[in-house]
Regions:
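Short acidic-hydrophobic catalytic motif
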Residues: 1-301
Length: 301
């Protein structure tokens, strides 16, 4: 299979989920063997680095890449869409420290890629072919198994101690189904997580338009009012538990976790031929697994 890049550029602008900063992002065609590279156009010298696991420095509610002054947060949704559509080479220019969150999914990235199309290049794709089972287990009970397969496949299972999200599964057995089955799954959080995240200086750009918020633990009306006021949202009835906005899929949280896995594992720096099976994944665990797999890949060269 040959490498591919974009046929034409496309652009987005919007606020960052965690910084709240308004950001412009340009996606440009790139020469073969470039990989996915991100340029901070707002910094002196326009520092540019490849989006690979080597530069992951933080994973609190998103994946952060950092090397010296160069730092870009919440890269996983854009990377997920690029990987799913087979974009091997692309230069992403951003004028701030974070990718725009858009609606919290990969939908708009997918639509843009579909609109401009792909350009086949001369070089062959770089592919890591899984030849034997690989297993990673975290101390917190997260698991990842990567198995040999004829193609790229992902299975996800998530569990939470709550009635709404006690257990969900999502699967993707063909990347051709990504646009329909995965791309519109939005990032999510629980109401009980919002105040701690705000205190950590995160989700400054969060609202009900760019995240699926889950209200599963009853709280006082005063407490819920505080949360919605902080997010600049209309006040809600504290007696009504559930999702605070309509679902795009019945198992949207699990599908979004799958979306994140594709983006995080793309930090390997090449394509993967194998089946990824995960239990209780998250950005920290995903990127730790990717780093170990990348070290294995580099050591074999």
């Amino acid at each position: 299979m040959k490498q591919h890049t974009l046929k034409a550029p496309f652009s987005f602008e919007g606020k960052g989920l965690h910084t709240g900063v308004y950001i412009h992002a340009n996606f440009l065609p790139a020469q073969e063997n470039t990989g996915i590279r991100i340029c901070r156009t707002d910094l002196e010298g326009r520092p540019t680095n490849e989006a690979v696991a080597d530069y992951v420095t933080a994973t609190e509610r998103g994946t952060v890449l950092e090397r010296g002054a160069w730092k870009v947060s919440t890269v996983e949704h854009a990377l997920s869409a690029l990987y799913a559509f087979g974009v091997d080479n692309c230069l992403i220019e951003v004028d701030g420290p974070e990718m725009p969150i858009l609606d919290g999914s990969a939908k708009f990235y997918v639509q843009a890629i579909q609109k401009v199309g792909l350009q086949e290049q001369n070089a062959e794709q770089k592919v890591y072919v899984v030849t034997e089972p690989i297993e990673y287990i975290s101390e917190r009970g997260s698991k990842m198994m990567i198995l040999p397969s004829e193609k790229y496949e992902v299975e996800v299972k998530i569990t939470y101690p709550t009635g709404l999200l006690r257990e969900q599964k999502a699967e993707l057995y063909d990347l051709k189904e990504y646009a329909r089955e995965i791309a519109s799954a939005r990032t999510f959080c629980f109401v009980r997580e919002i105040e701690p995240l705000l205190r950590m200086g995160l989700i400054k750009g969060g609202d009900l338009q760019n995240a699926l918020v889950i209200y599963e633990t009853p709280m006082s009306q005063e407490g819920l009012d505080y949360m919605t006021d902080k997010l600049g949202q209309p006040r809600l009835d504290a007696t009504k538990l559930g999702y605070l906005s309509p679902l795009n899929y019945q198992n949207e949280p699990a599908r979004h976790k799958l979306l994140d896995i594709i983006g995080d594992m793309s930090l390997l720096g090449c394509r993967i031929q194998g089946k990824i099976m995960t239990l209780r994944p998250g950005h920290t665990f995903n990127t730790q697994c990717c780093k170990r797999l990348r070290n294995k890949l580099l050591a074999s060269k």
